């Protein structure tokens, strides 16, 4: 789907809720995707190829121009080596790239411990962070954590995460989304931030300097570990990360229940002026909307315009939509990322 067509369709989707100017951010058309997942096609001659599904059928592919340049460079090299001695029962390959790093995961329908030596040699030969998975087993060679550097407002922000974390798959657009949020914040009075679905701190770390304090929640223990590490990487001291669901956070804020995970965090000490949410495709459930709608400013990052539209039907009863932005996360597809800025009605 062309960019202009995608924008027109989504403008129409939100037209009854928002009739002001919409900011639109385009993606590069090639080499933008930092995560690429392929199935494996086993040819009759014994060779393998990367493949993708179309109409439930595996279609072999030779290249993938929308993938990050590091992924494109490694694809043929890796395939040649897999064809030598590591293709048996291989059913998938996953690539994850950052500006400065790359990891590759091989998926097998067999006991991977039997090929440990071959995998080790492949990792050394190609200088790769290599992960192998089969049912209930995982082997890691040369580490699995990736380092990333984002350039936000001419400042470098440092991150570390692994393949199990949710990662924005278009680095260029990710930087633009973070800067869009900062542009909004710079025009407003700011106190403390509450962030839900914070992940490994993608937004949190970059926004730390714009608030007195931040309370950030996430249900994944591994994400919280990386978020704390990313605070250290950037010498940030004003963020409190805690592993709570939105329901648990609501109970804690209402003093209905105490949590050991909040030990050392004084919830009464936060003066929250802004809430940031970046939920999964299902959007916000009613309990989360009830939790956040009492706050003056809401910034909502969405990967699903349909569920965003449904949530805004409710939120717009208490809040005014001040800004709406479209981010072309996946160029030439129907997918669109959205950002919304809402303020409590007088």
UniProtKB/Swiss-Prot annotation:
Residue ranges annotated as coiled coil are none
What sort of enzyme, by top EC class, is this?
Answer: transferase
Which residues does the Swiss-Prot or TrEMBL record annotate as the active site?
Answer: 303 (nucleophile), 337 (proton acceptor)
- What Gene Ontology molecular-function terms does this entry list? rRNA binding; tRNA (uracil(54)-C5)-methyltransferase activity, S-adenosyl methionine-dependent; tRNA binding
Which is a Gene Ontology cellular component entry for this protein? cytosol
* Annotated catalysed reactions: uridine(54) in tRNA + S-adenosyl-L-methionine = 5-methyluridine(54) in tRNA + S-adenosyl-L-homocysteine + H(+); uridine(341) in tmRNA + S-adenosyl-L-methionine = 5-methyluridine(341) in tmRNA + S-adenosyl-L-homocysteine + H(+)
Q: Which UniProt keywords apply?
A: Methyltransferase, S-adenosyl-L-methionine, Transferase, tRNA processing
What EC number(s) does this enzyme carry? 2.1.1.-, 2.1.1.35
CDD domains given for it?
AdoMet_MTases
Residues reported to bind S-adenosyl-L-methionine: 168, 197, 202, 218, 278
Q: Which terms does the UniProt entry file under GO BP?
A: methylation; tRNA processing
Q: What does this protein do?
A: Dual-specificity methyltransferase that catalyzes the formation of 5-methyluridine at position 54 (m5U54) in all tRNAs, and that of position 341 (m5U341) in tmRNA (transfer-mRNA).
Give the similarity note. Answer: Belongs to the class I-like SAM-binding methyltransferase superfamily. RNA M5U methyltransferase family. TrmA subfamily.
HAMAP family the record matches: RNA_methyltr_TrmA (MF_01011)
Return the protein name. Answer: tRNA/tmRNA (uracil-C(5))-methyltransferase
